[in-house]
């Protein structure tokens, strides 16, 4: 979300469009990640990472879906998060390369933590917890994940659907903001 703040404070049309797009993407990705955490809790009945491990062995479909959303969280190419952050950085590079450098360090740190978390949940040693192994991913969960994945990749592969709606309104917002500053 730091990229959103950087996109908003520059008063640049490209950055504002990227920030709004990133907010939309963040709503999809964070909602999906919270839904994944709910799915974990439904199966493991624990909330602490130290008790989770070996999820890939017991629930491979659910852990693969979780991987896709974790990669979207770190702005993997092809996802909507990548488009939003890429557009913000395109506009930001004209304003301040120092801010781009600091934000890039933050993105790298976030990616390391995200991948470490996924590795710990999916591939660590299997913990001896009482697990009800009914289904890997039940039908209702699968349909919700399918809808979230559809929008994640739709906006990642065809971002003009949203950007065409944003062009004029972002231009108007920037013009009003510049008048307020003067």
Residue spans of the language-model regions?
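Functional transmembrane alpha-helices
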Residues: 1-135
């Amino acid at each position: 979300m730091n990229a959103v703040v950087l996109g908003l404070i520059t008063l640049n049309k490209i950055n504002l469009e990227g920030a709004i797009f990133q907010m939309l993407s963040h709503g999809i990705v964070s909602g999906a990640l919270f839904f994944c955490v709910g799915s974990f809790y439904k199966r493991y009945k624990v909330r602490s990472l130290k008790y989770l491990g070996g999820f890939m062995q017991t629930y491979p479909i659910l852990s693969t879906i979780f991987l896709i959303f974790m990669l979207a969280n770190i702005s993997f190419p092809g996802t909507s998060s990548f488009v939003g952050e890429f557009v913000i950085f395109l506009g930001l590079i004209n304003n301040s390369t120092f801010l781009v450098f600091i934000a890039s360090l933050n993105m790298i740190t976030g990616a390391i933590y995200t991948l470490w978390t996924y590795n710990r949940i999916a591939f660590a040693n299997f913990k001896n917890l009482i697990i009800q192994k009914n289904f890997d991913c039940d039908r209702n969960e699968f349909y919700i994940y399918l809808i979230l994945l559809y929008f994640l990749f739709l906006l990642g592969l065809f971002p003009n659907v949203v950007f065409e709606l944003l062009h004029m309104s972002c231009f108007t917002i920037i013009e009003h903001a510049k008048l307020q500053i003067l």
